[in-house]
Amino acid sequence: MIVKIIKGDITEIEAEAIVNAANSYLEHGGGVARAIVEKGGYIIQKESREYVRKYGPVPTGGVAVTSAGKLKAKYVIHAVGPRYGIEGEEKLEEAIRNALRKAEELKLSSIALPAISTGIYGYPYEICAEKMVKVIKEEYTNFKHLNTIIVSLYSEEAYNIFVNIFERELAKEKNITLKMSP
């Protein structure tokens, strides 16, 4: 398993799936969600609305899949993270776990994730990084297809926090190669 931590724009990453930090109604009006629709095209919002019409709102911790429009990825996996102080940290783990499992179910080899719930939902970067690395350590041995996880961070602050936590937590993991590119 290769885990890459990258400072940059998730919409520019070459991965088979990119994860969108979404709300339950898959209305992509702000943050990373808005950037994904702006770069990938309205088809992503259109498919998201069709999903919600057909299946109802995505519960916190859940995921939904759409095409990726004009993005380099094949799919967008919309993960609904929790709001800080309102919904528990276990829902953040669940959103990350479900996104990774969905990529494996789709037989994808690579996925890019943002710092889910750290924007308007208010989670500190430290908690998100700790939950993400915990889920990766718990799940990676179950994956037959997924072999590259890219964590894409927009700010210098987020990048530095994730690098420190991932270096500390993955130091003893022999089967995970950690790569960083600022």
Swiss-Prot record:
PANTHER family the UniProt entry points to: GANGLIOSIDE INDUCED DIFFERENTIATION ASSOCIATED PROTEIN 2-RELATED, MACRO DOMAIN-CONTAINING PROTEIN
Domain of life: Archaea
Protein name: Uncharacterized protein STK_23830
SUPFAM superfamilies (UniProt xref): Macro domain-like (SSF52949)
Domain (Macro) ranges: 1-170
Cross-referenced InterPro entries: Macro_dom, Macro_dom-like
SMART domains, per the entry: A1pp
Species, as recorded: Sulfurisphaera tokodaii (strain DSM 16993 / JCM 10545 / NBRC 100140 / 7) (Sulfolobus tokodaii)
PROSITE patterns reported in the protein's UniProt record: MACRO
Pfam families, per database record: Macro
